[in-house]
UniProtKB/Swiss-Prot annotation:
TPR repeat feature ranges: 1279-1312, 1326-1359, 1361-1393
Subunit text: Interacts probably directly with DLG1, DLG4, HOMER1. Interacts with DLGAP1, INA, CAMK2A, GRIN2B and GRIA1. Interacts with TNIK and MINK1.
Protein name per the record: Protein TANC1
Keyword Phosphoprotein belongs to the record: yes
Name of the coding gene: Tanc1
Record region (Disordered): 1-47, 59-109, 264-309, 430-481, 1410-1503, 1527-1605, 1635-1711, 1812-1849
Stated role: May be a scaffold component in the postsynaptic density.
Species the sequence originates in: Rattus norvegicus
Top-level taxon in the UniProt lineage: Eukaryota
Length: 1849
């Protein structure tokens, strides 16, 4: 038969092993879909599915409940390999990577989830130090996306790097790296604390195993850690309460796709950082240096029911197959399209901080409980539970046990509490008859036998109810009963159902994992969820790997300890919480050979529960002994006759069912009407028969309701009397003949034998696996399944479970005297399942192999073969499994089979050919024998030794099985192994033998036994050692670990075995006393001193016990040693004292104690370092503070000239540095190498210290800037410091100094290189530009102010601050339209800023007023009164939310004078002949322009139309004026030469500095692009000024009359322009002071500059001037080196040059220009408008950089000259009309002549340092003629101006 069963095409199998798609069910994940999904929604390949099912297509039983399950059989594509992180494990012969399954339709109501990247997201936040973050926050500086994290070195990293020597047993000396004072790495003094600080140190041998390999990682595990949340997190973890009886989903649950994550590199016993990415290739093994897993007890109670399944190790929860896991991740329609291996390699290794809880709960569905069930009564039970749990005096108040027989409603009680709890959304609330309950639906055809769960009681949310339990004095006695269930439900935080149908629900690891998941999902424990997200190591501690390895440690460290800590921190409400567990007896069905069942696990863990965490469990009455030791109160449901409450509950249930069903009422009454007496009689009869069973009542009433039972008499003889009779009746109704049952029997057998629920397809394949010929058809099978649908309930994941555990038991076992009809044979089911695995085409994975072995053993089909043939049945069984799979060795070494082994299956695997020396994936790839020896599984060790396991097999750290057994304390295994010949003197790679391992853990009995064993005589061979050496090592090890019993035992045999109390061992080089002192083992030290240990005996490195104790901070040991005669001030080899050592390590208590004992505070070591120096070097602030208070010298220098402040700055603790500075440490101290503390901090990238020192006044020298090179974070801090200094000067009104600091900061910006992120610097640069713009605006240099604002906009186009700043500069320079455009942009970007809105309103009004004035002037051409538009208040910069706010409140004018635009039109004189000076004027105006908002273009052309006749223009400039011109030309020429511009540019733009007129030769095309760079700090590429705004009305009119409407000037107009321009030089001297400094219209952003507004064909002279009163050298001392910006080609629009129409806008000067505070000047302006003299436009046009060279020193200094000035020496002249530009065609025509006049206009105010700011208000505005009176009136109106403080917007 075996031959026939196994007969298959081997060549086909082998050929397809590497190509097949995947194991069905395990490697092809399930799609959970509702029962009401249409059948026709299946894909068209369904027939192929059926055919392949019959032919043995790859398939397996469902895998772990934490993995998705498959609903339809799918054929995978071949050769679909994963190119990603999944690698082929070396342990499996050739594991497949599953293919992509065929897409399966969604269930109805579900939506495809959005693809979610499975790669870990990298945090983009900058990882700079907290101090740097603090600084940035304080300054309000936004770093954007921050500096690349690679540029930051945290203090912790530096600590680790700097203290590497310390961790290696090396003390820091002057080089901060080397010394030999502390123990070596291998010394127990230095490293064993990692081995003993754990709780279970005496139980694990792993404490000295320091390999990076994990003890728990499985390189190809399938339940890896957190097989995280897939869409089934919510879908599969609910209950059947969400479903109707017909299987349809009541409320469509939308699937959410989450990623499958793995965080499995951390075990519960070894703390280690998790790997970065969820898809990290092979899981890192972790060091087992910690507590090893607690050995499992092997005790097992004798149970009433025999243990039918020892399947803990055969659980299909797969921990081994990565390929299986990835197959699950390829689940159709459930996972992201971008699968794990689609992520980029870069992201794969990025650090990952999980934002989700990567844990997944089990799926619990209770088939007998559905939404149409009702729950009646049990209020008394809930009340008793509540009273007992809240009774603090009761010893059994840790929980409650509800005991009851089969069908008594235990599961219904638990489900009621779950439904009303915070998890009610996952497990739908039980339906009830109350109006608030969910709508009930019922389908009689699908009514199933099951427990009654139903409840007419209110089902409102338990969270809102019962927050406060009812008081004891409540009058209404019923209310406490009703509130009890709500109170209990409101405290439920987790639940668990044990179901024999599903192995996973009965296993301890899954229990721990699922409980943890539900705890973090409960509303009450939100803090626990947050903690798991913050600390991924906790999630790793709770993953399935960790739970399999040591569930006790996982539960304790992953659940109980975090919850206790959160409770202590008051992050969890001060309430009691409850965990529900149903059916503990069910878990006994799957008791493992080794390890705990759930009941024994709870018994172990319950003492560790906090008193506020309770358990409510249920158990059958005949299994009470499994919970006999639990401190729980016991509540019984079996006390039926004696408990009236139980009786009332049963009656209430019957009454409810009868009244709610007309069918039942019609059945029991003759007339179909409700007769109370009859109903009461029926109720009483049923209650008496059921003996308290709700299940009996439910099934019986269901029969009544469907009409299967009809009561014809009062005897009720037709009513069954027991559950057995009810099941028999139901089966008889389903199967009318025996043959009908026989056809369905195989299905029941398979369902009984399976370890977990199976889908219809899996059952179908198992049935056909038993057929050699004539396979069953799918339609026939479907009919059988339909017949069994009332017994095998289909769950949400399409798997099937028995309707009730009692029915499952009834099918396999009957009591004496009961009918044996319908008995099933599970053995046949096991055989069918084994055949199914055998006929599977693809290779079985580890879990499937173990499961196959389980089914082969359970089937036992070769029973009796030995009697017939003499061959043991185990041989054919071994052949069977050997032929069926190739991965026997891998299955034997699977993780679950190691920790909870199935001995019988393991034997079968070994018989089949598994390698007993196979290396596992735990304990540093130890062989199986080593792992089992470590775990103490004696039976498995014996089995392995029986089959020849190698005794000398070692793990990667060199430990053999004897070392592991000795370290773990397994005495029996040590004896067994030594008797089998294990070598006692074997050394691992650390040089430790089994004797030392036992001494380290304190196992004195094993140590004594090993001493009595035979040791090798003679000289030790390599890898061995003598017994005396081992004993000396054991003494040191025991002393360091504090095992006094072992130390005493060893000292007692000192004479016999040559043990010296002062001896130094050969392993660590320690004496017993130095080891104990370094560990702080005071008791051992006292014992050793009593036994004669020398107090001053040093170890091999020369470190005495006193230094060992002082270094580790054990002051009690120090006191003991000093009391025994030690000197308090000894010196070691480096000259250090114990005080220095203690200070270096930061042990304040030890430092205090040593000083109290007279330790010298001023002692210096050989490097000149004191105790304070060492404390500063290591950053121990508390010690530093104490030493300084005790009088330590704060400026003590070492041999290298370093002070404690230098060392503290080197370490990087900002608070220590701050303390030292506040205590008087010299902040500018320079050591022998020329370094200061600030330089050291910068060099070490200690940003917090840099910030602290800068705050305290540290100066920035060249060394600091040099050290900051390539350190962007530090450089930003230094630049911010410069900007802060500038801000301070700005607030003090020192504009020049502030601008210098800003310029200096700009020069220090790094050059942009490849790979550098300049965004943070750009933000800072923007702030500097804005601050410079404010400075220039305050010094009246509006052109540069505008330019800097434009530069800020270049870097940050969306900066509303920059738009605002530029708008203010434009407004001040009378460019209202351009300012309006910028303000409108600013309002768009920041619509809530009130200051911008206020200024916008003003500018709009000014524009309107300007237009009105122009119209009035055209109607009545009279000069308008001056307009003072510069007294508007400017809001503080803080209102604009500048990055680095400068208090511009100081710019506010306290004057209440508002902008007043005179409404009266100015009388305009009649037009005159075009002036002959216009051509010279026009030549001067041809300079580079600046792009601006287009609105400003029209403003220029409009204002150009204004002409105002100004009298008194002299024909030649004065001598002094020519001198000024010469100076300016020299300055401009030097500037251009120094900036390496071409000589052509110099000659064309800067004519010879001669007082005689000269022509400017400038080509029309070239002159536009030529520019010079100024010498001043703000000399950027600037063109001519915006003087079009200043044009007088009369001049504009004259120009209009002279123009021909074309862009080319007529020859007749040329001379007039020449004559006008020739004498414009005087206006230079007059216009500058009249403005309080020239309005620099040199902003490259604005087309209002005249060179751009001129016709493109006209020549232009881009002359750049510097009108600074300071010298060139002083003005260039802080030059920023800005590159001059060339003209913008966008400004060639000629349309703006045509000045046509009479509606052109003009800009009258109705008020004095900004800064005029003199009342006389204002009065003259107001009362004498005709005498107003507009300053020459040539000054604005040609003095392109006027007032740009040195921040307008002229304006920032108070004038000293009298009103005469040099202007008083000038000849009277008529000032040309302001604003006359080359827009006018008439002017353009005259450009070819009199170019020699240009130099006359290019004057510098260099000699006007003391010149008052003259306001030529008295100059008569009359037709152009020379007038002495006009000259006099001009001079009288000129008033000195006070230093300008910007008070106007």
């Amino acid at each position: 038969m075996l031959k026939a069963v196994l007969k298959k095409s081997r060549e086909g199998v082998k050929g397809s092993k590497k190509e097949a798609g995947g194991d069905f069910g395990s490697e092809t994940p399930t799609l959970s879909s509702s029962g009401d999904s249409p059948v026709n929604s299946l894909s068209t390949t369904e027939d192929t599915y059926r055919v392949s099912l019959a032919k043995g297509v790859s398939m397996s039983l469902p895998s772990s409940p934490l993995l998705p399950r498959q609903s339809h059989l799918t054929q995978s594509r071949a050769n679909k390999k994963s190119p990603g992180p999944v690698r082929k494990p070396k342990y499996v012969e050739s594991p497949r990577v599953p293919g992509d399954p065929v897409m399966i339709p969604f269930r109805e109501g579900s939506k495809p989830a959005e693809p979610i990247e499975t790669e870990a997201k990298v945090d983009n936040e900058p990882s700079c130090s907290p101090a740097a973050q603090e600084l940035l926050t304080r300054l309000g500086f936004l770093l954007g996306e921050g500096i690349p994290s690679a540029t930051h070195i945290t203090i912790e990293d530096k600590n680790e790097a700097m203290c590497t020597a310390l961790s290696q047993g090396i003390s820091p000396c002057s080089t901060l790296t080397s010394s030999t004072a502390s123990p070596s790495t291998d010394s127990p003094c230095s490293t064993l604390n990692s081995c003993v600080s754990k709780t279970a140190a005496n139980k694990s041998p792993c404490e000295t195993i320091s390999s990076p390999s994990s003890t728990l990682e499985s390189k190809d595990s399938g339940i890896i850690a957190t097989i995280t949340s897939s869409s089934e997190n919510d879908d599969r973890s609910g209950s059947s309460l969400e479903w109707n009886r017909d299987g349809s989903l009541r409320l469509g649950v939308q699937k959410g796709v989450l990623h499958d994550r793995r965080l499995d590199n951390c075990s519960p016993v070894a703390e280690e950082e998790t790997t970065g990415s969820a898809e990290s290739v092979l899981p890192k093994a972790e060091s087992s240096a910690g507590d090893g897993p607690v050995p499992y007890s092997q005790s097992s109670g004798s149970l009433i029911m025999p243990r039918p399944n020892s399947v803990a190790a055969t659980s299909s929860t797969k921990l081994e197959d990565l390929s299986y896991l990835d197959g699950q991740r390829n689940a159709p329609l459930r996972t992201s399209i971008r699968l794990p291996w689609h992520s980029t390699a870069g992201a794969r290794f990025a650090p990952y901080k999980p934002q989700e809880i990567l844990l997944k709960p089990l799926l619990f569905e209770v088939p007998s409980i559905t939404t149409d069930s009702v729950f009646v009564g049990r209020d008394w039970l809930f009340q008793q539970i509540e009273e007992n749990l809240r009774n603090t005096e009761l010893a059994e108040n840790r929980g409650a046990v509800v005991v009851g027989n089969v069908g008594f409603g235990k599961t219904a009680i638990i489900s009621k509490l779950v439904a009303l709890s915070c998890h009610g959304s996952r497990m739908r609330q039980v339906a009830s008859s109350s109006p608030s309950s969910s709508l009930k639906t019922s389908d009689p055809t699908h009514d199933l036998p099951g427990t009654p769960l139903l409840s007419p009681s209110s089902s409102t949310s338990a969270l809102s109810a019962a927050r406060t339990p009812p008081g004891p004095g409540t009058v209404d006695s019923q209310r406490p009963r009703e509130d009890a269930v709500k109170y209990l439900a409101s405290r439920v935080v987790a639940y668990h159902y044990c179901q024999a149908d599903n192995t996973y629900t009965c296993l301890v690891p899954e229990f721990v994992h699922s409980i943890a998941t539900l705890l973090c999902r409960s509303h009450q424990l939100a803090a626990y969820r947050d903690l798991l997200i913050r600390e991924p190591q906790l999630q790793s501690m709770l993953n399935l790997r960790s739970c399999v390895q040591d569930p006790v440690a996982a539960f304790k460290r992953g659940i109980l300890e975090p919850l206790t800590n959160l409770r202590n921190e008051q992050k969890i409400p001060e309430e009691e919480y409850i965990i529900l567990i149903d059916g503990l007896n069910e878990a006994e069905f799957h008791k493992p050979d080794h390890g705990d069942t759930l009941s024994s696990f709870i018994t172990k863990i319950i003492p560790k529960f906090p008193p506020w965490l309770k358990l409510i469990v249920t158990v059958r009455a005949d299994f009470q002994e499994i919970i006999s030791t639990l401190p729980f109160v016991k509540l019984s449901l079996d006390d039926f006759p004696g408990n009236q409450d139980i009786h009332s509950d049963l009656h209430a249930y019957v009454q409810h069912r009868v009244h709610s069903s007309q069918d039942i009422l019609s059945n029991i009454s003759l007339n179909g009407k409700a007769d109370a007496a009859l109903i009461g009689k029926v109720s009483s009869r049923l209650v008496l028969r059921n003996l308290g069973s709700y299940l009996y009542l439910k099934l019986t009433l269901d029969l009544f309701q469907r009409g299967h039972l009809v009561i014809k008499s009062a005897s009720y003889k037709v009513v069954p009397v027991s559950l057995s009779e009810l099941y028999l009746l139901q089966c008889n109704m389903k199967f009318m003949t025996q043959s009908a049952f026989d056809r369905a029997l195989p299905i029941l057998n398979v369902a009984l034998a399976s370890l977990h629920p199976m889908t219809d397809e899996q059952i179908f394949q198992a049935i056909n696996a038993g057929h050699i010929q004539g396979e069953q058809g799918w339609e026939d099978f479907q009919q059988k399944m339909e017949a069994l649908s009332c017994f095998l309930i289909k769950k949400r994941d399409k798997t099937r479970m028995f309707c009730h555990p009692s029915f499952r038991e009834w099918l396999v076992w009957r009591a004496d005297g009961e009918s044996t009809a319908f008995l099933c044979e599970p053995r046949n089911g096991h055989a069918l399942l084994a055949f199914m695995f055998s006929r599977q085409e693809s290779k079985l994975n580890r879990q499937q192999t173990v499961e196959l072995g389980h089914h082969i053993l359970k089937a036992h089909i070769f029973k009796g073969l030995s009697k017939k043939t003499g061959v043991s049945s185990s041989h054919p069984q071994a052949l069977w499994i050997g032929y069926s799979t190739e991965g026997l060795s891998a299955a034997l070494a699977s993780l679950r089979n190691l920790y909870t082994p199935n001995v019988k299956v393991s034997r079968l695997l070994i018989l089949g050919g598994a390698n007993v020396n196979y290396r596992t994936e735990v304990l540093n790839n130890a062989p199986i024998l080593c792992v089992q020896s470590h775990l103490g599984h004696e039976e498995v060790v014996t089995l392995l030794l029986e089959f020849g396991a190698c005794l000398d097999g070692m793990s990667e750290n060199g430990m053999n099985a004897l070392c592991y057994a000795a370290a773990a304390g397994h005495m029996k295994l040590v004896c067994l192994l030594t008797k089998k010949g294990a070598r006692v003197d074997h050394l691992d790679k650390k040089g430790q033998c089994a004797l030392v391992h036992s001494a380290l853990r304190g196992h004195s009995d094993i140590l004594q036994y090993l001493l009595n064993c035979e040791w090798s005589a003679g000289p030790p061979q390599p890898g061995t050692l003598r017994k005396s050496q081992a004993l000396q090592q054991a003494l040191t090890a025991a002393a360091s670990m504090g095992h006094s019993a072992v130390v005493q035992s060893l000292l007692g045999m000192a004479e016999e075995h040559e043990i010296e109390v002062n001896g130094t061992d050969t392993l660590w080089g320690e004496t017993a006393l130095t080891a104990a002192a370094g560990r702080g083992k005071l008791e051992i030290c006292e014992l050793l001193l009593e036994r004669g240990a020398a107090v001053s005996r040093a170890n091999r490195r020369g470190v005495p016990p006193l230094f060992c104790a002082a270094r580790q901070g054990h002051w009690q040991v120090v006191q003991l040693l000093l009391d025994r005669g030690c000197d308090v001030n000894p010196n070691d080899k480096q000259g250090r004292t114990p005080l220095m050592v203690a200070a270096c390590e930061g042990h304040l208590s030890t430092v205090e104690f040593l000083l109290s004992k007279g330790a010298a505070l001023s002692s210096l070591d050989k490097e000149g370092l004191s105790a304070l120096s060492w404390a500063c070097l290591k950053g121990h602030r508390a010690v530093v503070q104490y030493l300084v208070e005790e009088g330590a010298e704060i400026d003590q220098t070492d041999k290298n000239g370093r002070t404690p402040l230098d060392l503290a700055a080197f370490y990087g603790d900002a608070e220590t540095v701050l303390y030292l500075v506040e205590k008087g440490a010299v902040i500018e101290h320079v050591d022998h190498s020329g370094m200061r503390p600030l330089d050291r901090a910068i060099g070490c990238r200690n940003t917090a210290v840099v910030v602290t020192l800068l705050r305290k006044g540290a100066k920035l020298g060249n060394a600091a800037w040099a050290m900051a090179t390539f350190k962007p974070d530090i450089l930003i801090i230094l630049l911010q410091k410069l900007m802060e200094e500038g801000n301070v000067m700005y607030k003090k009104g020192k504009m020049k100094e502030a601008a210098q600091r800003y310029q200096y900061a700009l020069r220090k910006f790094p050059r942009e290189g490849p790979g550098e992120d300049m965004r943070p610097f750009n933000e800072l640069r923007v702030s500097l530009y804005l601050n410079l713009s404010r400075c220039r605006r305050k010094t009246n240099d509006f052109g540069l102010a505008e330019e800097f604002a434009s530069k800020a906009l270049e870097l940050k186009p969306k900066s509303y601050e920059a738009f605002y700043a530029r708008a203010r500069a434009k407004r001040n320079s009378r460019q209202f339209l351009a300012a309006l455009a910028d303000l409108q942009e600013a309002v768009k970007l920041c619509p809530t800023n009130q200051e911008i809105k206020r200024l916008l309103a003003r500018v709009e009004e000014e524009c309107k007023q300007l237009q009105r004035n122009q119209q009035q002037k055209q109607q009545a051409p009279l000069p308008a009164p001056p307009n003072d538009s510069d007294n508007d208040e400017e809001a503080p910069a803080s209102s604009l939310k500048d990055h680095f706010p400068i208090e511009e409140a100081e710019e506010e004018d306290t004057s209440s004078q508002e902008e007043s635009i005179s409404p009266t039109p100015r009388s305009q004189p009649p037009p005159s002949v075009p002036s002959p000076y216009i051509r010279n004027l026009q030549e001067g105006l041809q300079s580079k322009g600046r792009p601006a908002s287009p609105q400003s273009w029209a403003g220029i052309s409009k204002s150009l139309r204004e002409t105002v006749a100004q009298p008194g223009l002299v024909m030649q400039p004065t001598k002094q004026a020519q001198i000024v011109k010469t100076n300016q030309h020299l300055g401009s020429g030097q500037s251009s030469m120094r900036n390496s511009n071409t000589k052509v540019q110099v000659s064309s733009q800067n004519p010879p500095p001669s007082p005689m007129p000269g022509r400017v030769s400038a080509a029309p095309a070239v002159s536009r692009n030529q520019h010079l760079e100024g010498t001043g700090p703000f000399s950027t590429g600037t063109g001519c000024g915006h003087f079009g705004d200043r044009l007088g009305p009369s001049q504009s009119l004259q120009l209009q009359r002279g123009e021909s409407g074309t862009a080319y000037p007529l020859p007749s107009k040329v001379k007039a322009a020449e004559r006008l321009l020739a004498h414009a030089s005087v206006a230079v001297d007059m216009a500058l002071p009249s403005q309080g400094g020239p309005v620099s219209c040199s902003d490259v952003r604005h087309p209002a500059s005249l060179s751009s507004s001129g016709s493109s064909g006209s020549p232009s002279s881009s002359v750049k001037m510097s009108s600074s009163t300071s010298s060139l050298t002083s003005s260039s001392s802080v030059s920023d080196g800005f590159k001059a910006q060339g003209p913008d080609c966008r400004i060639r629009d000629r349309g703006t040059t045509q000045v046509q129409g009479g509606t052109a806008e003009h800009r009258p000067r109705n008020t004095p220009f900004m800064g005029i505070m003199d009342k006389i000047a204002r009065f003259q302006q107001q009362v004498n408008p005709p005498s107003r003299s507009w300053h020459c436009p040539v000054t604005e046009g040609l003095l392109t950089n006027t007032a740009t060279a040195a921040g307008l020193q002229t304006n920032s200094e108070k004038p000293a000259l009298k009103p005469g000035g040099y202007c008083s020496q000038a000849k009277p002249c008529s000032v040309p009309p302001l604003g006359m530009g080359v827009h006018n065609g008439a002017q353009v025509k005259e450009l070819e002549e009199n170019k020699c006049q240009v130099p006359a206009l290019c004057q510098d105010n260099r000699k006007t340092k003391g010149v008052p700011h003259l306001y030529p208000e008295g100059v008569s505005k009359q037709p152009l003629h020379v007038s002495t009176e006009a000259h006099r009136s001009h001079l009288t109106s000129a008033k000195p101006k006070r230093s300008f403080i910007e008070s106007n917007v």
